[in-house]
């Protein structure tokens, strides 16, 4: 056994006695500026350290990159579509949430939309295109089924041909 049973019982009953102070979410922060302060008994703080660094660090990274994209879009809406490439389903929800905080207008992640009130948007799947004899037929069928909100996924085969279709 890696850990002694007494320590595992301690962890099962552990309730951290810490205070956490942080800047408001979405606030601009510069390098080497403290974002979060955790105070309490050393053991309590150390047991929380890795989880806090993981959660805060990852979502801060995503929000920073997203804010740059939103700024480059110059007022045009930006949609988040990261679920297919995210590190696990919970990572996809975290990415959607952090992107929304950073200025994305919507997400393709239905669970994140439901959980956090983020507007949901999206396209058809690549499998939709693959289920038709040609890409153009798939696009026409999707446009007919979604005439008021049609966004086509153009990279199933070849992006240039997708744009032409």
Q: How would you describe each model-predicted region?
A:
Residues 11-17, 26-165:
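Buried, small/hydrophobic-residue-enriched core segments of structured protein domains
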């Amino acid at each position: 056994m890696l850990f002694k049973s007494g320590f595992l019982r301690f962890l099962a009953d552990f309730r951290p006695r810490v205070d956490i102070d942080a800047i408001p979410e979405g606030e601009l922060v510069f390098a080497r500026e403290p974002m979060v302060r955790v105070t309490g008994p050393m053991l309590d703080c150390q047991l929380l350290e890795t989880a806090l660094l993981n959660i805060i660090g990852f979502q801060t990274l995503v929000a920073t990159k997203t804010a740059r994209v939103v700024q480059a879009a110059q007022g045009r809406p930006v949609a988040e579509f990261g679920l297919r490439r995210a590190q696990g389903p919970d990572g996809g929800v975290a990415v959607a949430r952090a992107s929304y905080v950073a200025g994305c207008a919507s997400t393709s992640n239905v669970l994140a939309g439901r959980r956090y009130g983020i507007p949901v948007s999206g396209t058809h799947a690549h499998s939709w295109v693959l289920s038709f004899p040609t890409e153009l037929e798939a696009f026409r069928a999707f446009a007919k089924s979604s005439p008021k909100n049609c966004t086509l996924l153009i990279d199933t085969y070849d992006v240039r041909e997708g744009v032409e279709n």
